[in-house]
C-alpha cells in the first residue's frame, strides 16, 4: 500500500519528457490549492504564499481553492481571507465535505459568482470563540473585548457578502448553524451548487472538466 503523497507524471513546459512529481505540486502548477485540515499558522502561510506567488506569475488566470476543513484559528483564517481579496486573480472557492467556522468564512471570501459547494457538502457558521476562558480576570476581560471586536468585524463581512441584515447574521451566529449546499446558496454563502454545473454542461459534454484539465 503506497504511503505519502501520490506521484503523477507531469511534463514541465520546455521539457521533452514527463517526470514523476508529487500530486500537489502538479495541482499548484495548475493553480489549484487545497485547504483540507484545521486552519493553523503553517497551512495559512502555505496557502497565502502560494496565492501571492501565483498572482505574481499570472495575474489574469483564476485560482481554485478547494475547502474541506473544520475551521480553526481566527487570525489565521482572516489572513487567508484578506489575501484572497488582495491578490489580482479571481479565486474560486469550492466546498467539498465540510466548511465549518472559519472555513465557511474563507468559502464566503471567493469571488462573487465563483463560490461553489458540492451537492453533499455541509457549511457551518457560528460565533468566534476564545481559548483564554481560564485566564485571570483582567486578561479575560481584555480578551472578551478583543473577541467582541473581531466578532463584529466578521459579522459585518458575512452581512455584506451575503446581503443579509447585520442583525440576522448576528443572531444566526449565536449558535452552530449547519446548512446543506442548497441552503448555503439561499443564504448567500455560495453562488453555485455543484450539480448545477453538471446540468449546465451535460447536454454538450458527456464528461465535463474544468478548462485547465482538458489537455491532460
UniProtKB/Swiss-Prot annotation:
Keyword Secreted belongs to the record: no
Keywords, ordered alphabetically: Chloroplast, Hydrolase, Plastid, Protease, Serine protease
Catalyses which reaction(s): Hydrolysis of proteins to small peptides in the presence of ATP and magnesium. alpha-casein is the usual test substrate. In the absence of ATP, only oligopeptides shorter than five residues are hydrolyzed (such as succinyl-Leu-Tyr-|-NHMec, and Leu-Tyr-Leu-|-Tyr-Trp, in which cleavage of the -Tyr-|-Leu- and -Tyr-|-Trp bonds also occurs)
Q: Say yes or no: keyword Nucleotide-binding present.
A: no
The record's top EC class is hydrolase
Q: Where in the cell is it found?
A: Plastid, Chloroplast stroma
This molecule's function is given as: Cleaves peptides in various proteins in a process that requires ATP hydrolysis. Has a chymotrypsin-like activity. Plays a major role in the degradation of misfolded proteins.
The cross-references to Gene3D superfamilies, in alphabetical order and at most eight, read: 2-enoyl-CoA Hydratase, Chain A, domain 1 (3.90.226.10)
- Species annotation: Sorghum bicolor
PANTHER family named among the record's database cross-references: ATP-DEPENDENT CLP PROTEASE PROTEOLYTIC SUBUNIT
Which family would the database say this protein is a member of? Belongs to the peptidase S14 family.
User: Coiled coil: which residue ranges?
Assistant: none
Q: Which InterPro entries match?
A: ClpP, ClpP/crotonase-like_dom_sf, ClpP/TepA, ClpP_His_AS, ClpP_Ser_AS
- Give the Enzyme Commission number: 3.4.21.92
- Molecular function per GO: ATP-dependent peptidase activity; ATPase binding; serine-type endopeptidase activity
GO CC term (a single one): endopeptidase Clp complex
Offer one Pfam family short name for this entry. CLP_protease
What lineage does UniProt assign to this protein's organism? Eukaryota, Viridiplantae, Streptophyta, Embryophyta, Tracheophyta
The active-site annotation reads 101 (nucleophile), 126
Q: Which GO terms describe its biological process?
A: protein quality control for misfolded or incompletely synthesized proteins
Protein's UniProt name: ATP-dependent Clp protease proteolytic subunit
Q: How does it assemble?
A: Component of the chloroplastic Clp protease core complex.
Amino acid at each position: 500500500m503506497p504511503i505519502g503523497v501520490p506521484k503523477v507524471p507531469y511534463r514541465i513546459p520546455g521539457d521533452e519528457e514527463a517526470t514523476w512529481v508529487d500530486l500537489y505540486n502538479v495541482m499548484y502548477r495548475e493553480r489549484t490549492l487545497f485547504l483540507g485540515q484545521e486552519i493553523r499558522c503553517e497551512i495559512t502561510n502555505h496557502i497565502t504564499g502560494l496565492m501571492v506567488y501565483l498572482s505574481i506569475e499570472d495575474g489574469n488566470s483564476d485560482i481554485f481553492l478547494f475547502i474541506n476543513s473544520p475551521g480553526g484559528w481566527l487570525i489565521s483564517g482572516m489572513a487567508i481571507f484578506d489575501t484572497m481579496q488582495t491578490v489580482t486573480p479571481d479565486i474560486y472557492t469550492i466546498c467539498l465535505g465540510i466548511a465549518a467556522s472559519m472555513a465557511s468564512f474563507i468559502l464566503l471570501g471567493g469571488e462573487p459568482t465563483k463560490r461553489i459547494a458540492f451537492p453533499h457538502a455541509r457549511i457551518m457558521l457560528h460565533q468566534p470563540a476564545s481559548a483564554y476562558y481560564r485566564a485571570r480576570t483582567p486578561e479575560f476581560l481584555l480578551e472578551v473585548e478583543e473577541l467582541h471586536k473581531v466578532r463584529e468585524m466578521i459579522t459585518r463581512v458575512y452581512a455584506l457578502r451575503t446581503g443579509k441584515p447585520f442583525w440576522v447574521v448576528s443572531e444566526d451566529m449565536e449558535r452552530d448553524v449547519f446548512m446543506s449546499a442548497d441552503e448555503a446558496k439561499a443564504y448567500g454563502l455560495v453562488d453555485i451548487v455543484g450539480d448545477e454545473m453538471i446540468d449546465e454542461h451535460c447536454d454538450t459534454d458527456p464528461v465535463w472538466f474544468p478548462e485547465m484539465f482538458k489537455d491532460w
